[in-house]
Amino acid sequence: MSKNKGDDAPKNGGRKRKNDGDDTQKPNKKKSPPPPQDDPVHIFFPLPNPNIFSQMFNGDGNGKDDVPAKYKALKEKILKLNLDDKIKERVLARLKNVDSDKHKHLEWFELLLKIPFKKYAEIPVTKTDHPDRISKYFDDVYDTLNKATYGMQQVKEEIVNYVAQIVSTENKNMPRIIALHGEAGVGKSALLRRGLSECLKRPMKNFSCGGIRDSAFLNGFSFTYSGSRPGAIVNGLIECGVSNPIFFFDELDKISTTNDGIDIQNVLIHLTDPVQNNNFEDKYFDGIPIDLSKVIFIFAFNDIGLISPILKDRLHIINIPTPSIQEKVIIGTKYLTKELYPNIGFNEGDVVFSEEIMRYIITQHCEHDKGVRNLKRYIETILLKINTARFIGQKQKYKSLKNKLTFPIEINRDMVDELVDKNKNEKDEFFRTLFI
């Protein structure tokens, strides 16, 4: 009987007649629709078996695993990453070749595992919280901004609006990109570092555009290059530990106008494009998309005429006013001294700068400074020399401090004139401006 079945039934025809009732189900179990031809995973990494990811997790189906046993722990960590399965397939495929250049490949995996994929810092309040809690939070926002820097009320209102937008949208939409336009030393960085970053409880990473000479600084070098590393954007995410930090690009107008400078601007244009920045790729991690859509990008510059028109069109520019002499006096006595005291080892009140003395320093020693950067430098110089003198005692050389090292010390004009080398500071400022 079995012989007749084998003789009479052609290979394919017999099976079809035998399983007529299952025709509609069997193909669905064995076949899957062909992948789209423009899918980069299938262009560069052909996957003939639709269950390949399951095989990479459990082996090849015959109890074998292509990943060497000594890298099983690394494999498990990769499988836990918040990445799409197709991207995990691509990452796991690299494990097969680790031994060809072990140190370099392992470093690649270690850095990849440090990227905070889909890990977000939570907003301090939500729009569904109790109204009293929300109100208290925004009271704290105003207090934090006022403690960060003096004045700039219009700028602070813009930042409060920015924070409110993040709260109301629950950070699901990218808020407009803020750019601070103002003279050097007017407090742009302080307002962001001690203001916005503290209000949102998010880490902030600073990038000085004046020091960037190549776009690879931002988006890395290809893994194939010797000594290659990821760029500053990925390193910033790793350092901050979340995928929605604040990235502050200072001195945007210092980017060169050479071809390298244009490449740098193009990277920044890509970063700020809400259509593209959810698929940012570092050259070091080629093929691994990194979502930057939740990152808060903020820029600062002095000369608006040097900004790329395309990039400028995407920025909400806030003008930072130059402080008046009276505003500088308040900034010096209420803010700069309090910031410097603990850095040098003084308690608040050990060294006293009256408003009259602060005005004297401003008008006589840094009258050409539009911001307060030099004012801060002079206050720091005075404090450092007093700090040294109190340890040296009678051997110290400053006549204005003789017999006056009992705290609290009140600064007078003689001390300012002796402790601040006006000619040296003016010379330093002259040479500094040559390179701005």
Predicted ranges, named:
Residues 171-209, 238:
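Walker A/P-loop
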Residues 373, 378-436:
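C-terminal engagement/docking regions of AAA+ P-loop ATPases
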Residues 240-244, 280-300, 349-353, 405-411:
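AAA+/SF3 P-loop NTPase mechanochemical coupling elements
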Residues 1-115:
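N-terminal accessory segments that target, anchor, or regulate ATP-driven/P-loop NTPase machines
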Residues 88-121, 131-181, 233, 386:
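Pre-Walker A (pre-P-loop) alpha-helix and adjacent loop at the N terminus of AAA/AAA+ ATPase modules
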Residues 198-228, 236, 327:
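AAA+/P-loop NTPase substrate/partner-engagement loops
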Residues 80-84, 241, 303-313, 317-377, ...:
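Conserved C-terminal "switch" segment of AAA+ ATPases
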Residues 253-290:
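Conserved catalytic/switch belt of AAA+ P-loop NTPases
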